[in-house]
Design a protein with these regions (language model features):
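Accessory (non-catalytic) regions of SAM-dependent nucleic-acid methyltransferases
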Residues: 1-57, 63, 207-209
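Short coil/turn segments at secondary-structure boundaries
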Residues: 14-24, 74-82, 163-166
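Non-catalytic DNA-recognition/assembly elements of restriction-modification systems
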Residues: 42-75, 80-93, 185-193, 198-209
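Hydrophobic residues in beta-strands and at strand termini
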Residues: 52, 140, 180-182
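S-adenosyl-L-methionine
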Residues: 149-158, 162-166, 172-209
């Protein structure tokens, strides 16, 4: 994951984290965080909320993924229907807004609404698309599956990190510092597979109520 972050920084796709750190468990069984810029090491036992299974690791959210807001686009550049001239999906805080002639993201990402009533809204987007300023594109480092990130954020309850103002906004700078338990890749895939199998059953049950 650290190698992937270094590559993205070098390619200027993400900004260098001035407070980059690593979290590890010492010989005394306590958790420590080492800040790479200064070499400072501090015990973080009081910040660790619970024990995790063997093979899992505690990290901050910023160690797992980057979170980048999209770019502003004029309403006149967004069209209701897809066409040869406007083939790319334009994605806002609550999913599809329309279609446009350019894209600023390519891949498979979790998308988070970052302002107003749509603050904390989650979607998945694939391929080439345009993310507006109301959407945060979440890009997992390394080989972390985007669906694992999507379901993780769903469980995280993002609304708790919204600013308490007349126009709520997602405080990304706070979210990236949250401690998270990160399982090994095979376990990430098993978690996603299990959720995907259970969701249709949950929906069927909800419809029957």
């Amino acid at each position: 994951i650290r190698a992937e972050k270094a590559r993205l920084v070098k390619e200027k796709k993400i900004k260098k984290d001035k407070n980059e750190s690593i979290i590890y468990r010492g010989d005394d069984n306590s958790y420590y965080e080492k800040f790479l810029a200064t070499g400072e090491v501090k015990c973080i036992d009081e910040e660790i909320p619970f024990e995790i299974p063997k093979g899992w690791e505690w990290c901050r959210l910023k160690h797992m993924c980057s979170m980048q807001a999209g770019k502003n686009i004029s309403a006149s550049e967004i069209y209701d229907k897809k066409s040869v001239l406007h083939p790319y999906r334009c994605v806002g805080g609550n999913g599809l807004r329309g279609f446009t002639n350019t894209f600023n993201a390519e891949g498979h990402f979790a998308i988070i609404g970052r302002q107003g009533a749509l603050c904390g809204c989650l979607n998945i987007e694939s391929g080439k698309f345009y993310a507006t300023e109301h959407a945060v594109v979440v890009n997992g480092f390394g080989i972390i599956p985007s669906l694992f990130i999507y379901y993780f954020f769903t469980a995280l309850n993002l609304n708790q990190y919204a600013t308490a103002t007349a126009q709520p906004g997602l405080a990304v700078s706070n979210i990236v510092e949250v401690f998270i338990p990160l399982p090994p890749l095979p376990e990430q895939l098993r978690i996603v597979s299990k959720i995907e199998k259970l969701l249709p059953l949950v929906k069927t049950y909800e419809q029957a109520q």
